[in-house]
Structures are given as C-alpha cells and as structure tokens.
C-alpha cells in the first residue's frame, strides 16, 4: 500500500478551451497536513473540485486509498472518507449545532418511513448512538456551550469549526479545506488551527488546505505546494517556499 493517501496524475480541466488545471500532478502523504498556495486563478479551487468529484476532468486521474476515483461523484467519495469543506460554510441555519452534526451520517434507519413505523426501537437506538457521537464531537472541538445554539447564529469561525465537526461524524480519512481562514478573526483562526492539529495527531486525519495566510500555512503545513497556471510550480517546506526565487 502506498504511503500517499492521494495521488493526482496529469490532471487537466478545460473551460471553453482554457486550461484551469493543466497536466497537474501531486501526492498527499497519509497523515500529513499539506498546504496549497498560489495566486488567484492558479487552479487551486478547480483542483479541489476535481478531486472531490464536484467537476469532471478532461484528462488525467485521481487515486485515493489506492483506488481510482477519477470523476466519482462527491456523494460517493463522502462515503469513502474523502470530504471537502468550502470557503463559505454550509450549515443548516435553523437547526442547532448538535442537530447539524446528527444530520451527517447517511443511510440512517429513521430516514426510511417503513423502518420508523415497524422498527421504532432500532431507530431510537441508532439515534442514541449518533447523538452520543455528536456530543463527543462538540466536546472535542470545545463547542459544548453552543450545542443547542442555532447554527445560523454562529460566527464565521464557529461555523468553520462546525464543518470540521461534520467530518468527525463520518470518520474522514482525507479532508480538503478550502480557505479555512476566510472571514475568520485571528482568535478563532487560532482555535481552528488547534482543532486541525488535534485531529491530525489524535485521530490521524490527513488534511490538504488552500490558504492565503502564509503565517497560518507556515504554522500548520508540511509540505507546501505552490500552484501557478494550473499546475505545480514548487513543493517544499514553508521555509523552502519563502526562499525559492521562482515563487
């Protein structure tokens, strides 16, 4: 089995004849926190969309956990443990934090009306397990005091923490973080960083993040991948990136 949880090989995506991602190749090492940086229009978000199954590629392949997942839809990848968060958090604003977390696991018995009618004991037992896990998640992320708060009332940083919590409800293997620091104040960004590091060390999560804040990237990521014109320009430590004249 490869040490790399993700391999991108010669991936290309065209929009109207223009290459947003061009013959792009990179590896994400299992257990790492990898940063991806680059100017606007360098192809970072399009690359994430291709990996996460939100877009179909024109050429190349994506290998996740030694399986070819090229163009596999995002909902199938979700079930395999590859999750992507967005620059703008997507929460159910009228539900509480706890309810948002409990909505995540798929194929719950209670989703089936027949099960709800003829197997109420099974449904209640499963709901109890999911609720207990949701409480474990809010405790892990220090959100216990907000468990019964409506998600729509949370700050930008708290919503990002809630998105991280969702990944914990399905035991993600690889999480793609798209501008985790966007719209987040410095204090909550520090909390987000702490939560990511904790998930990485204690739960063995692998992360790959797009981020413009170089201080945050330097604190969090090794290696750092630099993209330009839809492909990888350079890869190294944050210090090597800072010293490289091409970057």
Can you annotate each of these PLM segments?
Residues 37-39:
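The feature captures the beta-strand-to-loop junction immediately N-terminal to the Walker
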Residues 52:
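Helix-to-loop junction immediately C-terminal to a conserved catalytic motif
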Residues 60-67, 79-80:
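Conserved ABC transporter NBD signature motif
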Residues 150-154:
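Conserved ABC ATPase signature
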Residues 217-219:
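A short, surface-exposed alpha-helical micro-motif characterized by mixed small hydrophobic
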């Amino acid at each position: 089995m490869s040490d790399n949880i993700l391999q991108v090989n010669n991936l290309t995506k065209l929009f109207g004849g223009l290459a947003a991602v061009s013959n792009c190749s990179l590896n994400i090492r299992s257990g790492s926190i990898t940063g991806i940086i680059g100017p606007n229009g360098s192809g970072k978000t399009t690359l994430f969309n291709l990996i996460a199954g939100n877009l179909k590629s024109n050429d190349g392949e994506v290998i996740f956990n030694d399986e070819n997942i090229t163009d596999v839809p995002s909902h199938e990848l979700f079930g395999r443990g590859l999750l992507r968060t967005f620059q703008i958090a997507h929460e159910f604003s009228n539900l509480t934090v706890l309810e948002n977390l409990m909505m995540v696991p798929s194929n719950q018995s209670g989703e089936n009306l027949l099960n709800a009618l003829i197997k109420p004991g099974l449904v209640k037992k499963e709901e109890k397990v999911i609720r207990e896990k949701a409480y474990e998640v809010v405790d892990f992320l220090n959100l216990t005091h907000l468990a019964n708060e409506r998600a729509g009332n949370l700050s930008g940083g708290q919503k990002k923490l809630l998105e991280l919590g969702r990944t914990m409800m399905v035991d993600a293997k690889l999480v793609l973080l798209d501008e985790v620091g966007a719209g987040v104040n410095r204090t909550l960004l520090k909390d987000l960083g702490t939560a990511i590091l904790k998930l990485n060390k204690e739960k063995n999560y692998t992360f790959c993040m797009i981020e413009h804040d170089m201080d945050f990237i330097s604190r969090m990521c090794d290696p750092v991948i630099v993209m330009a014109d839809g492909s990888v320009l350079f890869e190294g430590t944050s210090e090597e990136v800072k010293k490289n004249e091409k970057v």
